[in-house]
From Swiss-Prot:
This is Large ribosomal subunit protein bL32. PANTHER family: 50S RIBOSOMAL PROTEIN L32, LARGE RIBOSOMAL SUBUNIT PROTEIN BL32. GO terms for biological process: translation. It comes from Glaesserella parasuis serovar 5 (strain SH0165). It comes from the Bacteria. The lineage of its organism: Bacteria, Pseudomonadati, Pseudomonadota, Gammaproteobacteria, Pasteurellales.
Amino acid sequence: MAVQQNKKSRSRRDMRRSHDALTTAAVSVDARGETHLRHHVTADGYYRGRKIK
């Protein structure tokens, strides 16, 4: 089992975690007022203003 030789400082630990922050989802509102994820089909089947089959 691997065991560290020296204790990592709070600074080193926090620098490693600097990229772990969560981001909010990019939500778009189309012309009809419906919200959806960018580059995704809406719940009622529209994409870029057109009805998808």
